[in-house]
Amino acid sequence: MHVLVIPSWYPASPEDVHGIFFRQQAQAMAGAGLQMGVLAPQMHPLYGPAWRQGLRARRSRPRISQEEGLNVVRVDLPAWLPKARWIDARAAFSQLERAFKAYVRRFGRPDVLHAHSLYPAGFLTYLLAAKYGLPWVLTEHRSLGHMPVRTALGRRAEQQVAASAARRIGVSRGHADFIAQRLGGQWDYVPNLLPPALETLTVSDHSDRPLVVGHLSVLDPVKRPELVIESFAAAQLGADARLVIGGPLTAEIEASLRQCARQAGVEKQLELPGMITDVAGFNQQLDVFVLPSITESFGMVLIEALATGAALVATDTWGANTVISDGDGVVVASADPAELGAAIRQVSTWPRDKAGRERRRESCLSRFALGAFAAKYKEIYAVAAASAHA
């Protein structure tokens, strides 16, 4: 089976981490026995500060590389009217098609196309699949709230795109149901893949160590990092407990978090290490991971923390309800610091020895490791491929 992945965003180079989970998933499926390739379009708007990149994109040629077992073709595309997604995709299609032909000449014709997220990949893959008679799969990772539909024509267009996919996948049950309301059709869900490198981690005994509570995110308002601080303070875990919040720090974000900690009386317990490159190492120090997001389609950070044996506390989101099962942590219906603090205090009393952490880790691996993920997507690809001959 030869699958060509078309993601809506993807690392710009082997060193880039933006969209790295698309690369990790494709590499994992290649390791599971499939031939995997990537066709990565990068849209560049013809307005705003980066308009020159948009102009250059009109003359972009496909760039072919082989990266850690993956055949990759990247192409820059001009975004003429990003809010008119159907028109935009059609305007960029001829350049995408040239990149697709370059891929086929070098690596062969795929059996199935797999688009990640509706725009731009879903729209572009729809056009490619229709022209070349290829079955395709659509996995949506976002809630699409940032992509409102402004016209009846726009709504019909995106529903037409989604309807043509052989299988439609969300990343959690609630997320799949929500996306189905907008795009129509039957949506199944497959949880995201735990990065395979985390499958081989070992857990350690924390029972004799001071308690460490942590949070890791992009630190934007949706993640509510200030609420992590307020909830930690409300938990009243004692002066020895530490709170570590990782993520990219601007001067404004750091000042806001430190002021919040001063007001909550936990300034001396707060650590802000900034951007985290070793996610596993960050999580291995934690006893409790807190994610009080407004919304999470899935929440990769939850399974990454659970894989190291940390207990989880999260607000009621689609992702939290998918990831957190009995014994993994607590889902809190409210964003009230007192209730979140009570949940943090509750899980802080759970066993922190090696056996306790190993139980939580095994709960994660049984549901999100490569074996479960690969089996589900192999079945999805087989159904999609069969639909082309039905």
Regions found by a protein language model. Give the residues of each.
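Glycosyltransferase donor-sugar binding loop
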Residues: 216, 242-256
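Carbohydrate-associated surface elements
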Residues: 174, 193
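N-terminal subdomain of nucleotide-sugar transferases
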Residues: 1-60, 66, 389
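Conserved donor-binding/catalytic core segment of Leloir-type glycosyltransferases
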Residues: 4, 205-232, 244
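Conserved acidic donor-binding segment of nucleotide-sugar-dependent glycosyltransferases
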Residues: 326, 330-337, 346-351
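A charged, aromatic-enriched C-terminal amphipathic alpha-helix characteristic of glycosyltransferases
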Residues: 352-382
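Short hydrophobic beta-strand element within catalytic cores of glycosyltransferases
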Residues: 311-314
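Aromatic "clamp/platform" in nucleotide-sugar-dependent glycosyltransferases that forms part
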Residues: 275, 294
